[in-house]
A protein has these predicted regions:
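Exported/periplasmic cell-wall-interacting domains
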Residues: 2, 32-33, 126-235
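Bacterial N-terminal signal peptides
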Residues: 13-23
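Residue-level recognition of short, well-ordered coil/turn positions
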Residues: 8, 24, 203-206
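Bacterial N-terminal signal peptides that target proteins for export
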Residues: 2-15
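N-terminal, Lys/Arg-enriched amphipathic/low-complexity engagement segments
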Residues: 35-54
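Signal peptide processing junction and immediate N-terminal pro/mature segment
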Residues: 25-37
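Gly/Pro-biased beta-strand-loop elements
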Residues: 55-168
């Protein structure tokens, strides 16, 4: 659910509430010389320490090579791998974790879904939409710190909330397969430790960019056809 804060506009069509649930250790972005070649080297070097999925690796290299993030910290959500990768402004991987994503498969959101009470969102519409989004920190109606991906659509990154379902969610994250990580209303919800240690310092201090990779079409198609045009409209 959304709350007070500045309105945001997604850079691609379709959005719904994103919540990240994950746990992982934080990395530190090392200083490196300016320039695209150096940034791409950082992406390649870090893959050995925190293996990127093939799709996330392709996306990260494309983003840095095209400077699509315009020097802002950015995150990549790989729904198929159920994993979140956070990068610093130079393209250095600073943290990664398993993630819960929308329980329904699909890359698009139904208009108005973000305005519904959680219990009223149809099962088929509980998707995590793919695309490129400008992010900004804020607070929801309960005063909880979140990272808004699209405020008007209620799309945000936030901590897992303490309730009866928390233990089950942690079990899903701890499992060896990403198949049981399709468990949110469409949100991306992270474990408090990961949110506080990685999301807050890198995406919670100012503007950023969140890339949600598609699951119904090739990732190369998303970046080859959409990103070059979208990058002209960076926040």
């Amino acid at each position: 659910m959304r709350g007070g804060g500045k309105g945001l506009r997604a850079r691609v069509a379709g959005c719904v509430c994103l919540c990240l649930l994950a746990g992982a250790a934080r990395g530190v972005e090392a200083a490196s010389p300016n320039g695209t070649a150096s940034a791409i080297a950082d992406v390649n070097a870090n893959a050995a320490d925190e293996p990127l999925s093939a799709d996330a690796r392709y996306a990260a290299q494309w983003i840095v090579d095209a400077d699509d993030h315009r020097g802002l910290p950015f995150a990549i959500v790989d729904k198929k791998a159920a994993r979140l990768f956070v990068f610093g402004p130079r393209g250095r991987l600073v943290g990664a974790a398993p993630a819960l994503v929308g329980s329904a498969s699909g890359d698009h959101a139904t208009p108005g879904t973000g305005q519904l009470e959680p219990a009223r969102i149809p099962l088929a519409e509980r998707t995590t939409p793919a695309g490129r989004f400008a992010s900004e920190p804020g607070r929801n109606l309960g005063g909880e710190a979140v990272v808004w991906v699209d405020y008007d659509a209620g799309l945000a990154i936030h901590r897992v909330r303490p309730d009866a379902a928390e233990a089950q969610r942690e079990q899903r994250l701890a499992s060896a397969t990403p198949d049981d990580n399709r468990a949110s209303l469409g949100c991306i919800v992270v474990m408090p430790a990961f949110y506080d240690g990685v999301v807050t310092p890198w995406l919670g201090a100012g503007r950023g960019v969140v890339y949600v990779l598609p699951e119904s079409r090739p990732v190369a198609e998303m970046f080859g056809a959409v990103a070059p045009r979208v990058s002209m409209l960076l926040p």
